[in-house]
Regions:
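Cytochrome P450
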Residues: 1-408
Length: 408
């Protein structure tokens, strides 16, 4: 990974709004990637500031401003939003384009991820969850990332796409590099590698259509009047590929780290496993507190927002974790309250680009809790093994060593 690009301060950026902040940086003393964001607030950072790091970008810190950027796609565009700027950059469908263009693919995908559609995936998610836990439950130890969280949502995603599960580790490595790399040249090369894999996949899938997302996209392409092109099919799959192989894994890692260190929370959740309403409320709170994604937008046109001059093509960073801990919106924002009744968190976004996979993500985490806690009720972090963390567009852990007393 190369040193992040540092850009000179543009003329429209006032000096008092400039802060030297690198969203990718992990210093030796950092133990939790959330802490680097909280430190911005603790140190009195302006609610809207500009950093010269990673090609230069704005960062919004307040809930209302982040919500506005989600809602207002006329000003804050999803199109060509990469940090650092990477060329060439794919026109990702549907999240990489704005209305009305994005509707074509979103309307194709929405029916696949409704609550009713996702409920039909329950049996498969549970089967996979049990199979993974069976492999290590009697060992008394596991690397939660390598043995469980890195395999459950990613394996399920590849199953839904109709991809070869024998190549799971290869796919994970490609998506992981995409999310972590700062060097735009290396990222462009990685994008090319992913497109190569997807091109090969679709050449095979053309002759082996099935009941999966990839086949649905190909059938849409071949439907007269759909307007769906081969390139758009691959662009859409690229987005699903990089989005589907990381965020739920990272969210699970933070949740299980919390459960490993706070027995009272373990017991409280264990008491809710067969109570859907209470479990659902607990899940919303877990997703609020552990929002792992840092979202990007690109300013579409020159505008003055809350007294700040934003220029067309400026990049904007939206840290969901700070929106979800804004005391102007949430009572006791730093506290994990599994009974919280009012919870308008932004973990899954808002507006036309709200996360398509939110119901599947909740199902996977709920099922993991339901299967894990009855079998491995008391577990802890193995402090003898160092834990490596990462920051960037998705925050998380490269490993999470856990131990428990195995049953005799």
């Amino acid at each position: 990974v190369s040193t992040p690009q540092t850009q000179s301060i543009p003329p429209h950026v006032p000096a008092h709004l400039v802060l030297d902040f690198d969203l990718f940086e992990v210093t030796p003393e950092l133990r939790d990637p959330f802490d680097k964001w909280q430190a911005l607030l603790d140190n009195g950072a302006p609610p809207i500031f500009w950093t010269p790091r990673n090609g230069g970008h704005w960062t919004f810190l307040k809930y209302d401003d982040i919500r506005e950027a989600y809602r207002n796609h006329e000003t804050f565009s999803n199109r060509h939003q990469s940090i650092p700027r990477t060329e060439p950059w794919p026109l990702l469908q549907p999240n990489g384009v704005d209305p009305p263009e994005h509707s074509k693919f979103r309307n194709l995908l929405v029916p696949l991820f409704t609550p009713a559609a996702v409920s039909l995936m329950q049996e498969e998610v549970r089967r996979r969850t049990r199979m993974l836990i069976d492999a290590f439950a009697d060992r008394g130890a596991c690397d939660f990332v390598a043995d469980f969280s890195g395999k459950l949502p990613t394996g399920m995603f590849i199953h839904l796409m109709g991809m070869d599960e024998g190549r799971l580790s290869e796919f994970i490595a490609l998506a992981d590099f995409f999310m972590r790399v700062e060097d735009p040249v290396a990222k462009a090369r990685n994008v090319g590698e992913i497109y190569g894999v997807l091109g090969e996949f679709f050449r095979h899938k053309e002759h082996h259509l099935g009941n999966d997302i990839a086949s649905l996209l190909l059938r849409a392409r071949d439907t007269a009047g759909s307007g769906v092109t081969q390139q758009e099919v691959i662009d859409c799959t690229f987005l699903l590929f990089v989005a589907g192989l990381d965020t739920v894994t990272s969210t699970m890692n933070f949740i299980w780290r919390h459960l490993a260190t706070v027995p009272a929370t373990r017991r409280e959740i264990a008491g809710h496993l067969e109570q859907p309403d209470k479990l659902s409320r607990a899940l919303e709170e877990l997703f609020r507190v552990y929002a792992v994604s840092i979202i990007y937008r690109r300013v579409k046109k020159d505008t003055v927002y809350k007294g700040v001059q934003l220029k067309a093509d400026d990049m904007v960073v939206l840290p969901d974790n700070l929106a979800n801990r804004d005391p102007a919106v949430f009572d006791r924002p730093a506290e994990l309250d599994l009974t919280r009744k009012v919870n308008p968190h932004l973990t899954f976004g808002l507006g036309v680009h709200r996360c398509l996979g939110s119901h599947l993500a909740k199902l996977e985490v709920a099922t993991a809790l339901q299967e894990w806690l009855p079998r491995i009720a008391d577990f802890r972090i193995d402090t003898a093994i160092p834990v490596k963390i990462y920051a960037g567009p998705v925050m998380g852990f490269r490993s999470l060593p856990l131990r428990w007393d195995a049953r005799a």
